[in-house]
Amino acid sequence: MWLDDVASELSFTQGLLLGQLSIVILIGAFIKFFIFGDPPSPDVSAALRATERRSRTLAHKRSLLTLRSSTPRHASQSLNRKRSSVLRNPAPLTTNAILSKTYYNVDSHQPESLDWFNVLIAQTIAQFRADAQHDDAILTSLTKALNGGNRPDFLDEIKVTELSLGEDFPIFSNCRVIPVDEDGITLGREGGAAGREHGRLQARMDVDLSDFITLAVETKLLLNYPKPLVAVLPVALAVSVMRFSGTLSISFVPGSPLNGSPTTLAFCFLDDYRLDLSIRSLVGSRSRLQDVPKIAQLIEARLHTWFDERCVEPRFQQIELPSLWPRKKNTRGGEDLDTGSEAGGIGRARSRDVERDLREEARKEVEAETGVRVGRSKLGVSLDVPDVGLDGGSEEGLRFRRRSRGRGDEYAMPGSMPGLSMA
């Protein structure tokens, strides 16, 4: 009996120790291979992401083709509105007509270098960086965006600790114009000229950027279980864009007069882009974990997903274009020309406006002080003096009143002539 109790106690102890040892081994293996395991090489990760994006794009195109074959398209009927007889009715402008009148052959035209466009983009980015260095507007906007309403409850306030906008500029090259249909699918040579009649033109260009654009933040993880603020874990992250290369597609989407939609500029990147990131992390306050590979993988995957969901085909961004007709309110420059020019006329008109405002202000002051209604004539300002309450009912010019107010009122003699004061 005693031997049976000892054997059962030993078996229970052995089982407990074996279970604890198994848990320790599993936790160690998880930390070693899942958290601190070596991440895949950047080339392998980029190839896997490109394959996934390509399969998603092909699936979207197949679904569009299936939808087209199942639902026949009908030509949209426009409303029969009476047009003005003054405006000439031009021939319908198709894609082939635009290509013919601009002498552009999409099948044989060589790609363009876009050197002039690179200079304009570089000047724009340089001015943007200079404005960012001048004030803290971009820092304030980033802090407000990071601490917006979407911030989870287990995160403390996010502070931006480093911001670098880089020093280099993107290089655009190999620009070509291709015809696409209304869904953005390329119309090849097999489509013929008839297939390009109702499509639109799309410009595609290669873009390459090799720079070091960095954003570093720090925050705290708030562990609120089993009670609020049971533990606080400081976390610091730094994300740097090292290189971006891809193909940018730009096209004009014409507006529809039926529903009142404006003309927009649509742009997106093709699914063959590559984005190389460098992510540094620091977790803890005393015993710190630096550059945890799993954290870098999670953040990099999240950033790629964010970019894919916004401006990688089949998704695209649209910018509403303003009216390109010249307008007076949009005119700038030319104020330093001679007086005989139009700008000189604008300056004289402004001076007349200022003078008129001064006269109006003086008239209101006279009315407030004397209770006399002041009227305006075509030649200047006159006073309409009522007969009641005044001696003689004579009129007094505004310039005399302004001159008398400009001098010392304590030296004015009662009953003296207008404009006459005692020195």
Swiss-Prot record:
Cite the entry's keywords alphabetically.
Answer: Endoplasmic reticulum, Lipid transport, Lipid-binding, Membrane, Transmembrane, Transmembrane helix, Transport
Name where it's found.
Endoplasmic reticulum membrane
- Report the membrane topology from the UniProt record: Single-pass type I membrane protein
Which PROSITE patterns is this protein grouped with?
A: SMP
InterPro entries of this UniProt entry? Mmm1, MMM1_dom, SMP_LBD
Which residue ranges run through the membrane?
16-36
GO BP term, example: mitochondrial outer membrane translocase complex assembly
- Residues covered by region (Disordered): 327-370, 394-423
Q: Which residues lie on this side of the membrane: Cytoplasmic?
A: 37-423
| Lumenal compartment segments | 1-15
Q: Does the keyword Membrane apply?
A: yes
Name the family the entry cites: Belongs to the MMM1 family.
Subunit comment? Homodimer. Component of the ER-mitochondria encounter structure (ERMES) or MDM complex, composed of mmm1, mdm10, mdm12 and mdm34. A mmm1 homodimer associates with one molecule of mdm12 on each side in a pairwise head-to-tail manner, and the SMP-LTD domains of mmm1 and mdm12 generate a continuous hydrophobic tunnel for phospholipid trafficking.
User: Could you give the domain comment from the record?
Assistant: The SMP-LTD domain is a barrel-like domain that can bind various types of glycerophospholipids in its interior and mediate their transfer between two adjacent bilayers.
Role played? Component of the ERMES/MDM complex, which serves as a molecular tether to connect the endoplasmic reticulum (ER) and mitochondria. Components of this complex are involved in the control of mitochondrial shape and protein biogenesis, and function in nonvesicular lipid trafficking between the ER and mitochondria. The mdm12-mmm1 subcomplex functions in the major beta-barrel assembly pathway that is responsible for biogenesis of all outer membrane beta-barrel proteins, and acts in a late step after the SAM complex.
Q: What is this protein called?
A: Maintenance of mitochondrial morphology protein 1
Species of provenance:
Sclerotinia sclerotiorum (strain ATCC 18683 / 1980 / Ss-1) (White mold)
**Gene that specifies this protein:** mmm1
